[in-house]
Amino acid sequence: MATTATRHQDSKLSEKAESILAGFKLNWMNLRDAETGKVLWQSTEDMADPKREHKAHVPKNLLKCRTVSREINFTSSVKIEKFRLEQRVYLKGTIIEEWYFDFGFVIPDSTNTWQNMIEAAPESQMFPPSVLSGNVVVETLFYDGDLLVSTSRVRLYYD
């Protein structure tokens, strides 16, 4: 009996995740030098789409920034109780950084802009763009509380 109840609960959670994903769209994203405010890269591609690995060509001078500001603009047709992201940065398949971001409550049928600051590793720990380009994948896990809604991957190229 408990197994049936667990399966029913898992099914409801899966339906909730599918509903959130179906109603979620990443409208645009940009990366800025946090010190100057200058936009270094922007995209209108929906990089939250989990069906494929995305590609982003970013300028190599992004690696010289001490702090990067990331803005994402997204729309959700459904309520999200505790929207949050977990990001893992992989270099040739090995995790080199992890970040955690909490947005909180998302109103149904709303469009939101979310800004995060990301501090660079010390210069002595930075790899050159030639080593990183094409070898870095940023994996983003989208959650509502503890419910995993989607996972997307973006391969970075430093031009």
Curated annotation (Swiss-Prot):
PANTHER family the UniProt entry points to: RETINAL ROD RHODOPSIN-SENSITIVE CGMP 3',5'-CYCLIC PHOSPHODIESTERASE DELTA-SUBUNIT, RETINAL ROD RHODOPSIN-SENSITIVE CGMP 3',5'-CYCLIC PHOSPHODIESTERASE SUBUNIT DELTA
Top-level taxon in the UniProt lineage: Eukaryota
Pfam families: GMP_PDE_delta
Species of origin: Caenorhabditis elegans
Cross-referenced InterPro entries: Ig_E-set (IPR014756), PDED_dom (IPR008015), PDED_dom_sf (IPR037036), Rhodop-sen_GMP-Pdiesterase_dsu (IPR017287)
Name of this chain's protein: Phosphodiesterase delta-like protein
Gene3D superfamilies for the chain: GMP phosphodiesterase, delta subunit (2.70.50.40)
A Gene Ontology biological process term: sensory perception of light stimulus
Family to which this protein belongs: Belongs to the PDE6D/unc-119 family.
GO CC annotation, single: cytoplasm
